[in-house]
Amino acid sequence: QPQWEGLTFSQKMKNMVGDLNVCSKKGLSERFDSTIGAATVLMPFGGAYQLTPQNAMVAKLPVDGETSTCSGMAWGFNPFLMSADQYKGAQMAVIESVTKLVASGFRYEDAYLTFQEYFERLGTAPERWGKPLAALLGALDAQMGLGIASIGGKDSMSGSFEKLDVPPTLVSFATAIGKANKV
């Protein structure tokens, strides 16, 4: 996590542009052909210069003939918030994924969620058990507030290698079916 206290504006800017989290991901995405099958509704990057990443993946359903029915999927996760507060991090992951989906033209009432979780090996330390519990409670709180259920998830509870632990992670994926002309 970047440290900002005691730095000049110039130092803060240099730190920020040196952070891999703010660099362009366009080169990585170009390794995947989004035009295969001619079903893509939203290309990975939009805008006048094709540099703005989309909020969601949207593609028409693969059917015989033509269709306007499409599926959308968006993700939500903030690693800094999740590391600081697992309850709020997971809660906001759910809200962010649904918000991106709605901003892409889908109805939140039609959305479903699925989660991908990674946590350190729990062992016998109570504070380690509290992290995934707090995250799941935060995600549940957001689901209850939105009236949207998670239809499953994949947990990876052994996110440790020797003495290294993965940071607490709960990524929310929101998905829905809609019409391409509404996107």
Predicted feature residues:
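Glycine/proline-enriched, intrinsically flexible loops and inter-domain linkers
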Residues: Q1-V183
